[in-house]
Amino acid sequence: MMKLIEFELEDVSFIGSGAFKTLKLPELTSEEKFLIDPIVAPTSGLRIQILDQIEKKGKNKLLLTNRKLFLFLRVFKAISQQYKEMKKGKSLKILIVTDNRPTKSILLQYCSQIFAFDGYEIYYQEDEPGESKISAPYGAASVALLEDINLIIVLTASHNELSWNGIKFYIDYPMPMSGDLFKEISNKALNFQEIKFDPSYKPIPIDAEKKNNDYVVSLISKVLEIKSIKNKKLVIWPYLGKARGIVTLFKRLGADIILIDEEINPPNPIKELREDKLKQVMESEGSEIAILLDADRDRIALYVKQNGEYNYYIPNEIYSALHNILAKDYQKKIINVRTIPSDLRGDDTSFINILTGVGYKHLGVILYFLLGIKVDKSKVDKAILYFEDENNNLRKIDNAKPLKRQLFDLIQKNSLFEEEFVIVMWEESGGHTLNILNAVGAHNIDSFRFDSKFPIIADKYPVPALVLITELIARGHEISKSIDWSIKGINRTIPAVDKQKIKIMNNFAKNDNRTILIKDKEYKVSALSDNINTIDIFQLKSNNSTLYFRPSGTGPEVRFYIFGDRETHLEELKVVFNYIKLHYS
């Protein structure tokens, strides 16, 4: 396959001629410091546009400069030092994995050399020589699924354009870094003057992918019997790479897979849809279901033919429909933990609705609360956590007790002492995670908590949901009939660097608890904040629509969301974000 982009490398000058190499680091500029230690905390690791566009001999080319490369090396070294200090230099093992981005090999190589010099055993996913590819969700979950490896680095920039790359890392738990620990690592990365490397490292192969697929098969068997996708022709289009883990899983479950081996930049199925290609492949192969995947497999879309018509579904629609079908048709009790700007069309069928800030650093706190697992105070302080009480009012929480009391009362009221609850944790951008929870000590509030027979994953892990919704579609369920189709949910962005993001949020804060008028339409404004009262999300609610906006944690932009009338939502969203951009930026 022809490469979508190619890039050139600047030469890196190392010192030393023995077994090890040393790199002297230049002083950081202010802009570089912000990239490593951003004002707006990232929702999931760091992402940096690693390739710069330059003009050379009259042609535009992409260049990986030393200064951009060195930012990644600083963060690798900081993670290594932090983990080494936490573990007192013992049991130093790391799994390093990547997606299929053009810069994957150079980052994998240098990352491995840095950790090898610091005394770590280096593990790779079984792959072609010199590669270690696995999906980001599988990489994150491996910290819970692999017995002896408690540090994972995933090199990915998710759905971002291919000139980007990034670092997600997991220590002990499959939950994104946040709070004090993330800050400590950023501070370390800022202060290095040199980094040492061991080029003679020998990675140890391990099949984390199979461990993950075994886990998925075991987990979904507690929700539904997978029977209707057997011998079903499924089209899978990974927008980058070959999605080996997901393809292998569906084949194991009996599906007949047609793989579209054609890459798209940016690798984002929510923004890029090639309907003509999909229809042509589906018609020629006799397939009715196509699965579209982003670069790191945590953002999915579906293209489905039912009743002679093709429909395209985005994550908000997929997950709301899945939850509604499981609740209505299969009598599952859903503990619905969702980010505030995600789809509200599954709320009515849920056992309880719990709303959080955007990202799994918020969602994961709720899971640990329910399981009685201690959560670092700095994580709770930075988390935005609410639940709906019996009157559908949002109650803010900074500890597990009020939420436990609400669930305890609901279980008592409905006599659900033996129920296996399906907890779903999901976000509007595509992340989804589910688990099975059992109530423990449900006759006494003091001993009440939840337990699970499955490993606890508190980061995005959408493959179980993907298998379940595919099975339900194969059984004849229709997404469009399982949610209120008169409502449409979508998001848009306006460009804004960190300082501009903060300015917009600060300027708009004066409208909290007020009603404002935008083009003859009234909106009630509510500010939603974390547990140290930093506002992270604004809600604007009219008589027939709900909008949100917040500073992005993954790029230089402010994100706007709307749930409104299918016919007018796009125009309404455009009016609102133009108004806010004009008056508050």
Residue map of PLM features:
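Glycine-rich phosphate/diphosphate-binding loops that line cofactor/substrate pockets in enzymes
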Residues: L73-L95, I220-N231
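Gly/Ser/Thr-enriched, mixed-charge loops and adjacent short helices
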Residues: K3-V40, Q49, S163-M282, L385-F387
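Short glycine-rich phosphate-binding loop at a beta-alpha junction
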Residues: G89-N100, K233-W237, K333-S342, I423
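Phosphate-binding and adjacent anionic-ligand microenvironments
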Residues: S287-I289, L293-A295, Y303, E309-Y310, ...
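N-terminal glycine-rich anion-binding loops that anchor highly charged ligand groups
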Residues: E31-Q53, F70-K84, T103-Q113
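Glycine-rich phosphate-binding loop plus the immediately following alpha-helix
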Residues: Y173-S200, P315-T349, P462-L466
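N-terminal small/polar loop signature for handling phosphorylated ligands or for N-terminal nucleophile
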Residues: K93-W164, I246-V304, V380-N399
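A short, gly/pro- and small-residue-rich
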Residues: L162-L190, I300-Y319, N438-F454, A458, ...
